[in-house]
């Protein structure tokens, strides 16, 4: 059952099956209710310097104790002040390059992380809250698409061309162009998620080609073959995607019609790119699948809940220290700047938000927040939201491919 309504600013939103309350006939609350009710976390630099203040106070107390003759107590105060903070800082510093540093793996699967041989494991990791029957349906659809995509690739009338461009800061970026629709002026620019590469776009390539799109599947900076020392969290990537859209406009001409799409971090990057003042006018539409609305708030939720399979841990001061260290590194930046919630109100193209209802990485309420931000701004007509039941992170396309491509096809057709 579809629900259709109007938001202020003229933007249209709709959500399919919003009234679903049961799974296999058993009443179940939304898996993400506890996160949707969590107060949004606001980054503060004071949180990063808090541990330093604690250390200084304890060392001062220790020095005072030693001065007045309480040597043992003074040493204990100093140890309590220095050791825990130093240990946490050291652990974060060692983990920082592993988490935010260049992610060069993920290229061994010819069909990418979702359609390749390890795709079943990836889907299960992304859909931990689903019943077995629901995961089996997703796996069936995934395997079916893998087979069809393989046959489609073998029959391509063109090759897969390695292409390059350069971002504003001189970072060399690499992608793969598939000009499978030479008669069409429509191009897809696709951005993958964290720790993946251009092959993640193969999950969607065949169906976008059927919609008349030539394809540009990019390696985000610090991923695949693209240069970059640090993962951009969407903030650095927004400028890279503007550069890629400009590349398409130069190649395909002024009458090119570009669809900018992405999943997860790539979706957030696409939204923020659409908010840039110099976005090429050829960009006619944006499809953002499971985009977070605020990277910092998402990271706090993931770290504190362990929703990616890691042990839950206190987000503060771990993330605060990581934020400070990354900002101080050469080529680093402030990860808290990555906030699609602010950018979507300035979008120069209509945005289709696709969201899995059972996403434990990017909770569904984030799509609602993005929809509200877009609908409340004078960003023009055409923004849409679709929620897909029984879909975990990046798995809406497998949970209900008919619904997914019905909505995406209509959106792409209407705006490009």
Predicted regions mapped to residue ranges:
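An N-terminal hydrophobic leader/cap segment in hydrolases
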Residues: 9-44, 80-165
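Conserved alpha/beta-hydrolase
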Residues: 205-227
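Short beta-strand/loop motif that positions the catalytic acidic residue
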Residues: 346-348, 353-355, 359
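Acidic catalytic loop of the alpha/beta-hydrolase fold
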Residues: 358-362, 394-395
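Hydrolase active-site cap/lid region
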Residues: 272-333, 342-343
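Conserved alpha/beta-hydrolase "acid-adjacent" motif
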Residues: 336, 360-366
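Catalytic histidine-centered segment of alpha/beta-hydrolase-like enzymes
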Residues: 391-405
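Alpha/beta-hydrolase active-site loop
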Residues: 231-252
């Amino acid at each position: 059952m579809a629900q259709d309504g109007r938001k202020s600013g003229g933007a249209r939103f709709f959500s399919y099956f919003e009234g679903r309350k049961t799974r296999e006939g058993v009443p179940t609350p939304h898996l993400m209710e506890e996160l949707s009710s969590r107060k949004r976390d606001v980054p503060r630099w004071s949180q990063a310097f808090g541990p330093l203040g604690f250390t200084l106070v304890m060392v001062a107390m220790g020095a005072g104790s030693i001065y007045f003759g309480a040597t043992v107590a003074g040493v204990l105060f100093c140890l309590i002040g220095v050791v825990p903070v130093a240990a946490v800082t050291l652990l974060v510093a060692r983990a920082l390059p592993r988490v935010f540093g260049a992610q060069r793996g993920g290229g061994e699967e010819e069909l990418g992380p979702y359609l390749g041989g390890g795709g079943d494991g990836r889907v299960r990791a992304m859909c931990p809250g689903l019943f077995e029957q629901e995961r089996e349906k997703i796996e069936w659809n995934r395997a079916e698409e893998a087979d069809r995509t393989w046959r489609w690739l073998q029959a391509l009338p063109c090759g897969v061309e390695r292409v390059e461009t350069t971002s504003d800061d001189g970072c060399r970026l690499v992608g793969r162009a598939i000009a499978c629709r030479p008669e069409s002026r429509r191009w897809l620019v696709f951005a993958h998620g964290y720790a993946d590469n251009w092959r993640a776009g193969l999950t969607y390539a065949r169906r976008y080609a059927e919609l008349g799109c030539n394809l540009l599947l990019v390696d985000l900076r610090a991923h695949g073959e693209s240069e970059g020392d640090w993962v951009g969290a969407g903030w650095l990537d927004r400028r890279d995607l503007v550069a890629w859209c400009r590349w398409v406009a130069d190649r395909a001409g002024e009458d090119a019609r570009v669809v900018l799409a992405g999943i997860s971090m790539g979706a957030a990057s696409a939204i923020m790119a659409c908010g840039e003042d110099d976005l090429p006018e050829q960009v006619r539409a944006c499809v953002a699948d499971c985009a977070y609305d605020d990277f910092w708030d998402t990271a706090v939720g993931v770290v504190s809940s362990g929703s990616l399979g890691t042990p839950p841990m206190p987000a503060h001061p771990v993330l605060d220290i990581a934020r400070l260290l990354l900002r101080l590194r050469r080529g680093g930046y402030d990860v808290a700047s990555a906030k699609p919630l602010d950018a979507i109100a300035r979008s120069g193209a209509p945005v289709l938000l696709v969201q899995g209802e059972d996403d434990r990485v990017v909770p569904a309420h984030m799509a609602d927040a993005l929809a509200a931000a877009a609908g409340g701004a004078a960003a023009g007509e055409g923004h849409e939201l679709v929620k897909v039941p029984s879909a975990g992170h990046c798995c809406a396309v497998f949970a209900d491919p008919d619904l997914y491509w019905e909505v995406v096809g209509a959106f792409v057709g209407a705006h490009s």
